[in-house]
Regions:
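Non-catalytic, membrane-anchoring transmembrane segments at the edges
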Residues: 1-311
Length: 311
């Protein structure tokens, strides 16, 4: 019954994306080389692209005027974050993290510099995604209706606030590159029963063949595992108590710092440069995760009785 319900949910989610007729070469290449999609990744699925371009979604051929607010807002966000990226690249160059001068600093200063450097790097993605989102909305893609209100959030690739304030790896993953995440979920993850490590390795393979990608996503699977342990063993103890907010804040700090350590590997591409970058940071991300996981193994699960009382 559980398996039947699972496939039923998967089937219903996919219905909206079904392609009812085989696309012509013109339609296919028009979708593949659609400029807003090239700029920010394929933000929309072929079904939506086809329906908008052929006046099926908007039979009159006139696009809703309500989209202009979302177009201008995302355009402003895109320009703002790209400006932050340019400034950050000047004052926080990533290559400095590989130098002896960086390694000579205290661990606290190195960790802070690492975080700020890759915060600036993330701004590049924030900016490009928001520009691509703005152009897609201008073309009529991404309209959703929630509670009877039209919203232009259907092609959003990033929830910046949710990502930067996430207190777990799973929350950060859901907020980052959302359209690709949805595609991978529909086409791969929901069709398999493999573990979390497999999921992260598929993501690494999707990005490319640089060895550093597999270091990055391998560490990401460990961070996800650590988050699952804390959710099972710690979260029931603090939920609904005065410790809930400190727990979430500490979780956010851990995810952002270890996440920045992961990104250092990803953006160094070769194994040698990635390993050097981790070494210059004293392998703090790896040591922190392994020590945290071992410690969590020895913490007993919260009693069901105590959890029920708090709930």
């Amino acid at each position: 019954m559980e398996r039947t319900d699972r496939w039923g949910r998967i089937y219903r989610r996919r219905q909206a994306e079904y392609v009812t007729s085989f696309p012509s070469l013109l339609d296919y290449f028009g979708f593949v080389y659609h400029f807003p999609g090239l700029l920010g990744g394929p933000n929309t699925y072929y079904r939506e692209y086809h329906d908008v371009m052929n006046n099926i979604r908007y039979p009159s051929g006139k696009l809703p005027a309500t989209r202009w607010r979302a177009v201008l807002l995302n355009l402003a966000k895109g320009c703002f974050f790209l400006a932050l990226f340019v400034v950050g690249s000047l004052y926080l160059p990533a290559d400095f993290l590989l130098t002896a001068s960086f390694a000579d600093r205290s661990l606290a200063r190195r960790v802070l510099r690492l975080y700020l450097t890759f915060l600036a790097v993330r701004c590049r993605y924030f900016g490009l995604w928001k520009l691509g989102e703005s152009l897609c909305i201008l073309d009529g893609f991404g309209e959703e209706t929630k509670d009877g209100v039209s919203q232009w959030t259907g092609i959003s690739n990033i929830d910046i606030w949710a990502f930067e304030t996430s207190s777990s790896m799973s929350a950060a993953t859901r907020a980052w590159n959302k359209r690709t995440q949805k595609w991978l979920q529909m086409c791969i993850y929901e069709r398999s029963n493999f573990n979390q490590f497999y999921v992260f390795m598929v993501s690494a393979f999707w990005h490319g063949f640089y060895p550093s990608y597999y270091l990055c996503f391998g560490l990401g699977s460990l961070l996800q595992y650590a988050n699952r342990l804390t959710a099972i063993k710690l979260w029931p103890r603090v939920k609904g108590t005065w410790m809930e907010t400190p727990y979430l804040v500490l979780g956010n700090v851990c995810v952002m710092l270890v996440g920045s350590y992961m990104l250092e590997a990803m953006f160094n591409y070769s194994f040698e440069r990635a390993w050097l970058g981790w070494k210059q940071a004293s392998f703090f991300g790896v040591v922190f995760l392994f020590c945290g996981i071992v410690l969590l193994w020895f913490i007993p699960k919260a009693s069901r009785e105590g959890k029920d009382k708090r709930d």
